[in-house]
């Protein structure tokens, strides 16, 4: 009987603990750069690092432009956030979606397709994201206007 109570308690505890596989509505309150934002959800401020992408650093060519594009797209808007884990800087890694009456925008993908971010090097084999990046390259969108662009991971390594 004691074992049964313990098992029931354990199962309930697991379901009551917050998880990093969360999906929630939030308002974007600050854009830090082209791949990091602050959102507010239920009076909590949460720092989100957009999954799958790596935007130019602010001091890099196109860094400010990338931030401005993201700002225009999502600042002060209500969004859906899907998070799955945290990075080494304790930021929530997540997907951000804007749902309007007639469309849904996957913000992470929009940053790649518009030429405002690279596919993060871990996800280079994702065919959907690769097609978006190739579209931006072929059409010389955003950072692909120039041929000598430096990927953010190379820029950070060489600083």
Segments predicted by a language model, with ranges:
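Small beta-barrel nucleic-acid-binding modules, primarily SNase/OB-fold domains
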Residues: 2-10, 15-159
């Amino acid at each position: 009987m004691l074992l049964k109570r313990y098992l029931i308690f354990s199962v309930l505890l697991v379901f009551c603990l917050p998880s990093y596989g969360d999906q929630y509505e939030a308002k974007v309150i600050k854009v830090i750069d082209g791949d990091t934002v602050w959102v507010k959800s239920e009076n909590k401020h949460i720092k989100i690092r957009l999954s799958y992408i790596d935007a130019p650093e602010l001091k890099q060519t196109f860094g400010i432009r990338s931030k401005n594009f993201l700002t225009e797209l999502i600042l002060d808007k209500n969004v859906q956030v899907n998070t799955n884990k945290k990075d080494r800087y304790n930021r929530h890694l997540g997907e951000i979606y804007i749902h309007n009456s007639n469309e849904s925008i996957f913000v992470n993908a929009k940053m790649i397709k518009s030429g405002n971010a690279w596919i993060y090097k871990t996800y280079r084999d994702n065919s959907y994201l690769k097609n978006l990046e190739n579209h931006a390259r072929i059409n010389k969108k955003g950072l692909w206007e120039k041929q000598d662009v430096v990927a953010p991971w190379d820029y950070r390594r060489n600083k």
